[in-house]
């Protein structure tokens, strides 16, 4: 008889109930819990999965390149990026009648197509790609890279090529390699591409495989580099009237420090970007030589941590500092993953911010729907990564934390004074929540009674001060860069060459948008969401080992549900339920963030900033003038007269609501409910002649509480994302194309 799924757990494989299937799926990637798993085997399996992950990413990129080259309009778009709408791919749908075919035959295509809101056209154009042939070449290259990555993953699972546990635990060597080679070397390589290919293309000089060896990226060649006269590479930048992609007004500089934006493409200067990557690359290459490995020189991370102790003789014992942390982190994959996810989460949110405020891709600032989609996309990814960071922090405390090895160090002391941390986060959340909601509701009441002048409107003076210090003149605050005679301004004037930062911050760009009372309120609403999410995540991790109500929680494992007051209130210390609740709050918060970004920009793009400024100070303004007003076009995708090209978003909007609402059925429930439900369904099936023709291999049993809630959370999250994605894209593209 064939072995039952899952092969990695004999205990589960022999389970006679449907628990076998669901727990098998749930623990498929929890390698630590698999039968016969050793620490070395665990590291080897994870190492190989990295190559599989790279292969999937490569395949995805390859597919994008291939479909745009085959079914897109890249070459037509390149000829006129401001007026041609980029095509993502063709649509073939057997349900389409003539009306739908006509509605989706757009952007100069001869058959139904989807419009691209990914920014890929802008990216490829900026980095020097101009033809479909180049896209095909890129696609084939990425496909080969994916195949190579898959082979590498397979190879490192073979006995002769499996790295040892000592190799994985060599933190200094790994850090040097990641810093110098992966970050440093790749940044310098990217500078090379920008200087040798992208910048010449932006000046109308094609560089391809046929001529890249004999086209000098700079007229002076490598002479200035070897003589130390590097300033030559910054001389003669592109002029302010340069037409992007042509020699008209082009300069010869390759590494500049101009600041601001190219006036026509409204993106950062490519020569500034090249300079940035070169500097970053050099810093990382230096950083990659800092840690002691084979030659006995450089720092030992363990020594650095052991040396970081609080001063002796300080009033109150400050503990053992960072002693024991090196081994704790180096021996815990969950701790390392938590740190990596938190770092990546912050960086992803920063990418969302920078992609719109300081766009690096030519003409993307004028593709409003793409800007909205990319901002929203990156903020949603950021919250998922941040929640994951704390989830693995909780698992670390349950599976990997050793109280003896961390006695009285900073980690142990975090656990010891967790009540202070949690209660501080709690009062901050309560303060922000009551005061922000109080202001909004007060304003709602006075507006609804016809006295809008009685609103409490608070100017964000501290934020305006920061903007003024950075050079924004409109607030009339003579401080730092807003004051021509300040030390900051004088220092800026002494930097040689032309600089355009002040033009950018005071011009019609997205750098430091003007802010007022509406921004002040929504800023504090977002702060409430962030602090509440953090409270739930931090409490979930710090209470994962146990709390006052259940000090031995760690002995019950990780899959411990919040099960009401029956056992003395286990909701207090279920890391699972803390994670679920935090995801709801994170989605809530990212909703406010993206609503704010989108509405403010809709007002700017349509030339009607007064609408945001006047309506954003009370809740009904948000519901009526942002959500309701902007969903009307979307819902009209289908109407009595047929359908238009918003129909797909209208359908997705409705379907997203359905998925979202389904989630609540799984959330408002308990285990007895699921057992009754499943037994009722089984009873009905057993009395139906067709369903009874097949044997029941597994006895159906109820979902556990933790499982039922994750099903609810999955529906809530997916529905939430689908609904807002449809709303965002349809409401923006319906207005601006």
Curated annotation (Swiss-Prot):
Residues holding chlorophyll a B3: 665, 673
EC number: 1.97.1.12
Biological processes per GO annotation: photosynthesis
Chain residues that bind [4Fe-4S] cluster: 562, 571
Keyword field contains Magnesium: yes
GO molecular function: 4 iron, 4 sulfur cluster binding; chlorophyll binding; electron transfer activity; magnesium ion binding; oxidoreductase activity
Cofactor note: PSI electron transfer chain: 5 chlorophyll a, 1 chlorophyll a', 2 phylloquinones and 3 4Fe-4S clusters. PSI core antenna: 90 chlorophyll a, 22 carotenoids, 3 phospholipids and 1 galactolipid. P700 is a chlorophyll a/chlorophyll a' dimer, A0 is one or more chlorophyll a, A1 is one or both phylloquinones and FX is a shared 4Fe-4S iron-sulfur center.
Protein localization: Cellular thylakoid membrane
Sequence positions that bind phylloquinone: 674
Residues that bind chlorophyll a B1: 657
Complex formation: The PsaA/B heterodimer binds the P700 chlorophyll special pair and subsequent electron acceptors. PSI consists of a core antenna complex that captures photons, and an electron transfer chain that converts photonic excitation into a charge separation. The cyanobacterial PSI reaction center is composed of one copy each of PsaA,B,C,D,E,F,I,J,K,L,M and X, and forms trimeric complexes.
Family: Belongs to the PsaA/PsaB family.
Name recorded for this polypeptide: Photosystem I P700 chlorophyll a apoprotein A2
Organism from which the protein derives: Parasynechococcus marenigrum (strain WH8102)
